[in-house]
Amino acid sequence: MAADGQCSLPASWRPVTLTHVEYPAGDLSGHLLAYLSLSPVVIIVGFVTLIIFKRELHTISFLGGLVLNEGVNWLIKHVIQEPRPCGGPHPTVGTKYGMPSSHSQFMWFFSVYSFLFLYLRMHQTNNARFLDLLWRHVLSLGLLTAAFLVSYSRVYLLYHTWSQVLYGGVAGSLMAIAWFAFTQEVLTPLFPRIAAWPISEFFLIRDTSLIPNVLWFEYTVTRAEARNRQRKLGTKLQ
């Protein structure tokens, strides 16, 4: 233990760069974009939370695709080894290579995969056709806008060049299309068998791939069960 008034410090310190984003002092736009560039972290936390509470195989597969996408990004960066712009003004960044942008690749994978899921995987099951299409269009527009803004933030904050975020977006989009096709054609037919495994039953892993609109299904089933229990409770009180 150090004596009073003395500190024994390590020779060097390293920051946790996962949430470390720098922006120009006094720049409000840069400040907002710095927070926006943390979107991938928020999305990953959301996925983990969703998997813990829903335990659905397609969600697990989606997260697996995101992890694979990050691995591909790391591999491409270390093959190309293109430096970041301006000689690397951010000394605490995780890697000195910038081609392609991992933030851009992540966000475009997430947005394009979600876009394909909304329009090709989820199908209309009720009569509110207009409202169903409206919320899909609005959500898709929001996802694509978020992907663009996160990509733009990496250029604005001098973490990447335009070409680096552009190629990151292209790589993420292509990975999303490939992973969506692989999930639909290869993994989805296996989901019922995987859900029947003893370990899956132990952890309450479920498969909803045969349900066209999970949101509508869960809503109707929950509402019907709540009404049924309410009737039973009313009968007991009489």
From Swiss-Prot:
Main location: endoplasmic reticulum
EC code(s) of this entry: 3.6.1.43
Gene3D superfamilies linked: Phosphatidic acid phosphatase type 2/haloperoxidase
Enzyme class: hydrolase
Superkingdom of source: Eukaryota
Reactions catalysed: a di-trans,poly-cis-dolichyl diphosphate + H2O = a di-trans,poly-cis-dolichyl phosphate + phosphate + H(+)
Coiled coil residues, start to end: none
GO cellular component: endoplasmic reticulum membrane
Intracellular or extracellular location(s): Endoplasmic reticulum membrane
Chain segments annotated as transmembrane: 33-53, 100-120, 130-150, 162-182
Pathway(s) the chain acts in: Protein modification; protein glycosylation
Membrane topology field: Multi-pass membrane protein
Single GO BP term: lipid biosynthetic process
GO-annotated molecular function: dolichyldiphosphatase activity
UniProt keyword annotations, A-Z: Endoplasmic reticulum, Hydrolase, Membrane, Transmembrane, Transmembrane helix
InterPro entries: Dolichyldiphosphatase_PAP2, P_Acid_Pase_2/haloperoxi_sf, P_Acid_Pase_2/haloperoxidase
Function, in words: Required for efficient N-glycosylation. Necessary for maintaining optimal levels of dolichol-linked oligosaccharides. Hydrolyzes dolichyl pyrophosphate at a very high rate and dolichyl monophosphate at a much lower rate. Does not act on phosphatidate.
UniProt record similarity statement: Belongs to the dolichyldiphosphatase family.
UniProt protein name: Dolichyldiphosphatase 1
Organism encoding this protein: Rhinolophus ferrumequinum
Record lineage: Eukaryota, Metazoa, Chordata, Craniata, Vertebrata
